[in-house]
UniProtKB/Swiss-Prot annotation:
It is found in: Plastid, Chloroplast. Signal peptide: none annotated. Its main location: plastid. This is DEAD-box ATP-dependent RNA helicase 58, chloroplastic. It is an enzyme of class 3 (hydrolase). The lineage of its organism: Eukaryota, Viridiplantae, Streptophyta, Embryophyta, Tracheophyta. SUPFAM superfamilies: P-loop containing nucleoside triphosphate hydrolases. It comes from Arabidopsis thaliana (Mouse-ear cress).
């Protein structure tokens, strides 16, 4: 196989020691040594980290430090020598001190220049992982686009841009700042064209359509970018109408041999087949590394899953009863997309009908907001702005809110319509339980008909969770 998971079988003589704990004992200079880089950049035929080469730098390992009680490695220790000091300082100011599992496993590999597929559950820190890689490679003195992050939706793009700008914020240290541009659907492309030509940003966060438009108009080029990230890669390849444009970005507008490519997602169906396609289609280099951090449970343990069986005609009243009994602090109510047949018949979408019902029947204090793909971009942005200004909310949304949007105050997810796939269930549920340092149990409630019970059972089996029936 042309990819590898991060396996280190030769470490059997270190009892109960993981790959990460070995790296936790190394000094930052360890990663700069020629022999170490040779070990980490093992040839495609070896597919495994060459510990014989690593052993050449054994003097770098502190005496008696490889034990079961090794102090956890900090993000600074992992990134020292790669990421600029002012970025590390800002990272710690924001509150990123200790790495998540995906950061601990992926960053040492990313810093060697290898292409990576970051595969870990929602809320696991994939965004910060690839941003730290980008900041390790950016040269602020160079006036060109050096990193491109491709996202499926405007909302996720706004979120990634916000985190990137927080990290890149000017510090007291006398260094030139790193500029970040958001090139997202619905933006003012004329202004972006002028910006790209006059003073190209170092980092560009873009939706597929807007990015391809700029490239086709020759406003700028990405054949010289150092890093290309595709976030929510499974959605862009398997669930969107932009597959052709994504493939073109990866092969026609730039070459995988001239850049470092990073794919990220919580769900990559048939990941072995996907890795094979990455190599065969030349989306990545042949020695791409699939870093799969699989939690014991695919779902966050802080989530409690429930379901209520009801008739379709009674769903509005059942939802209202759940809102009154559960009294969520904030909630997202997921509604299915309107079918083409329903649109042609001139029917109102389910989101509109539900919004009208809630505004007349819900007596609680939460603000009722709407987010769906058919809204104009200004309305969508306004909804998210209202949410982030504080206060509780009831957000009625289609699956546009299921990917990447971070609303930490969300305590409840209501699946008014059951998601169509197990992947959609995973991403919807992952919008709750994201508040840092909170041990609060959050609720995922499903409103289903008796005919849909077997579908929910299949999701339970695949995602290894148990769903309790509620009687109203």
């Amino acid at each position: 196989m042309a990819s590898q998971l991060l396996n280190v079988p030769h470490l059997a003589f270190f009892p109960k020691i993981s790959y990460a704990s070995v790296f936790s004992t190394l000094k930052p200079s360890f990663f700069h040594s020629t022999s170490t880089r040779r070990a980490l950049k093992s040839s495609p035929s070896s597919r495994i980290i060459n510990l014989q080469a690593v052993a050449e730098t054994s003097s770098e390992i502190e005496s008696n430090s490889v034990t079961e009680t090794t102090v956890p490695l900090t993000l600074r220790q992992i990134c020292q020598g790669f990421v600029p000091e002012h970025i590390l300082h800002r990272m710690e100011e924001i509150g990123f001190v200790f790495p998540t599992d995906i950061q601990r496993e992926a960053l040492p590999t990313l810093f060697t220049g290898r292409d990576c597929i970051l595969h870990a559950q929602t809320g696991s820190g994939k965004t910060l992982t690839y941003l730290l890689l980008i900041f390790s490679l950016i040269n602020p003195q160079r006036s060109s686009v050096q990193a491109v992050i491709v996202v499926p939706t405007r909302e996720l793009g706004m979120q990634v841009t916000k985190v990137a700008r927080m990290l890149a914020a000017k510090s007291e240290i006398d260094v030139k700042g790193c500029t970040v541009m958001a090139l997202l659907d619905g933006g003012t492309l004329r202004r972006h064209k002028s910006w790209l030509k006059a003073e190209p940003p170092a980092i560009l966060v873009a939706t597929v359509a807007s990015l391809c438009h700029m490239l086709e108009k020759h406003i700028f080029r990405i054949d010289s970018v150092r890093v290309l990230v595709v976030d929510e890669v499974d959605f862009l390849f398997y669930s969107s109408k932009q597959v052709g444009s994504v493939r073109k970005l990866l092969t026609s507008f730039s070459s995988c041999d001239k850049r470092q490519t990073v794919f990220a997602s919580a769900s990559i169906p048939q990941h072995k087949h996907f890795v094979h396609d990455c190599i065969q289609q030349k989306w990545t280099k042949r020695d791409v590394v699939h870093v799969h951090v699989s939690a014991i449970m695919p779902m966050p343990l802080c989530l409690l899953h429930r379901f209520v069986m009801c008739e379709k005609t009674n769903k509005h009243q059942v939802l209202l009863a759940l809102l009154e009994s559960d009294a969520p602090e904030s909630a997202i109510i997921f509604v299915g997309e309107q079918s083409e047949k329903s649109k042609k018949a001139g029917n109102d979408p389910s989101t509109t009908l539900l919004m009208e019902f809630l505004k007349t029947s819900y007596k609680g204090s939460l603000e009722i907001l709407l987010l769906e793909g058919d809204m104009n971009f200004n309305s969508r942005a306004a909804s998210l702005t209202e949410i982030r200004q504080g206060g509780g909310f009831l957000l009625v949304s289609t699956d546009i809110a299921a990917r990447g949007i971070d609303l930490p105050e969300t305590t409840h997810i209501f699946n008014f319509d059951l998601p169509q796939t197990v992947t959609d269930y995973l991403h919807r549920a992952g919008r709750a339980g994201r508040k840092p340092f909170s041990d609060r149990k959050c609720i995922v409630a499903n409103l289903i008909t008796s005919e849909e019970r077997f579908v929910l059972q299949r999701y339970e089996n695949e995602l290894m969770f148990s769903c309790e029936e509620m009687m109203l």
